[in-house]
Regions:
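Alpha-helical transmembrane segments of multi-pass membrane proteins
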Residues: 81-90, 267-278, 306-316
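Membrane-embedded helical hairpins/re-entrant loop segments and their flanking transmembrane helices
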Residues: 64-88, 255-272, 296
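Extended non-transmembrane interhelical loops and adjacent amphipathic helices
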Residues: 72, 84-115, 207-221
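Transmembrane helix-loop-helix hairpins in multi-pass inner-membrane proteins
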Residues: 1-39, 93-203, 285, 289-347
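Transmembrane helical segments that form the transport core of multi-pass membrane transport proteins
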Residues: 224-278
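A short amphipathic helical element positioned immediately N-terminal to and/or at the very start
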Residues: 35-43, 216-228
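Membrane-interface helix starts
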Residues: 8-9, 43-52, 225-239
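Alpha-helical transmembrane segments of multi-pass integral membrane proteins
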Residues: 52-59, 90-97, 132, 240-244, ...
């Protein structure tokens, strides 16, 4: 009951942030009008909009395929349908919570309810998270090397978000590697930080959080050992997570071309969206609402006449439609599982 209330509050916060963000960006843009937005949608290429929708689904699909690869490799195979369901659960709750990994506990619980062991579930989710992080850093690096001008076009605020987002991703990778090779050092640093947070009254129960910390470090170490000896699995999961990142980035590119953007500037649009995704890790905001929008508009204002309309359409497909789709999948699964649960209780 407590978790349900907390999730409901996060959902309400997401809705409030979304409404506020839309109101701010539409009211502050001199070139935006609702009539113009509807005109843009009605004149958009159906083919490119279809491609954008397929790419949006790819964000859910490829994460699921990454989970399926790991589970199958570790001897606990899952179907494609269940893999997509676990992915949808992870994405849905990650969008509601401030953390990009906020959906993992919910996905872990669902996987365990379907018979996947806790160890395999945890490793599959963690491996996906690591490869997901490596993927965006790789894509961002390529964009910076190939088209550095995009970064230099952005204003100071957008650059700060992107730099913080990159630092957060690098720190996560460093922490993961250190857990593999120097577990004692990581534990000492984390213990110091935890004590400091407790003294600052940010955390209240040291022992409870310390136990969680030990569990996380143990999972990281198990996953790291797996990575060192299972190169084929590593490459497969990396590929699927790379495709997941590319899918969500390509939504913006397809929308850009679909509404009349010059195909010759497609990589510029790709770079702008890539940096928006990277910057989304800068602050603990549900769905990175406001941050992604700000960086997107900053990058696309040099590419299209009406960046707000393009942003609303692109973000609507890549984030909000995906959120609704994932929510529907979980609701359908809940309805299907409820009769079975009832029968089990009757038995």
């Amino acid at each position: 009951m407590k978790k349900s209330t907390k999730n409901l509050l996060w959902l309400l916060l997401l809705i409030v942030l979304t409404v506020c963000t839309v109101l701010v960006i539409t009211s502050c843009s001199k070139g935006f009008s609702f009539k113009g937005f509807m005109h843009l949608i009605s004149n958009a290429s159906p083919v490119w909009m279809l491609f954008a929708a397929i790419c949006a689904f790819g964000f859910v699909f490829f994460e699921g395929m990454g989970l399926k690869c790991t589970c199958n490799f570790l001897g606990e195979p899952i179907t494609t349908g269940k893999a997509i369901l676990y992915s949808a659960t992870d994405i849905y709750f990650s969008a509601l919570t401030p953390s990009a990994a906020g959906g993992q506990p919910a996905a872990l619980l669902m996987m365990m309810n379907h018979g996947v062991s806790a160890a395999v579930s945890a490793i599959a989710l963690l491996l996906n998270l690591v490869m997901y992080t490596v993927s965006i850093m790789l894509i961002s690096t390529v964009c910076f090397i190939v088209y550095p001008d995009m970064l230099f076009r952005l204003d100071t605020g957008a650059l700060i978000f992107i730099i913080i987002g990159a630092v957060v991703q690098v720190l996560f990778i460093v922490l993961f590697v250190m857990c593999i090779f120097n577990e004692k050092l990581v534990l000492a640093v984390c213990r110091f930080c935890l004590k400091l947070l407790c003294r600052m009254k940010i955390f209240h129960n040291y022992d409870e959080h310390y136990e969680k910390l030990l569990g996380i470090i143990k999972q990281y170490k198990q996953c790291g050992i797996l990575l060192r000896h299972k190169t084929v699995l590593l490459l497969k999961v990396f590929f699927h997570n790379l495709m997941q990142r590319l899918s969500v980035i390509m939504v913006a590119v397809c929308v850009f071309i679909g509404v009349g953007g010059a195909p010759s500037k497609a990589f510029e649009a790709f770079s702008a969206q890539t940096f928006a995704v990277l910057g989304s890790n800068a602050a603990p905001v549900p769905g990175a609402v406001g941050i992604v929008d700000y960086i997107f508009l900053n990058g696309f204002e040099h590419l299209v006449a009406d960046p707000v309309s393009v942003e609303l359409l692109s973000r609507g497909l890549s984030f909000y439609c995906n959120l609704i789709f994932c929510g529907i999948l979980m609701f359908v699964n809940f309805i299907r599982m409820k009769p079975k649960t009832g029968l089990e209780h009757n038995d």
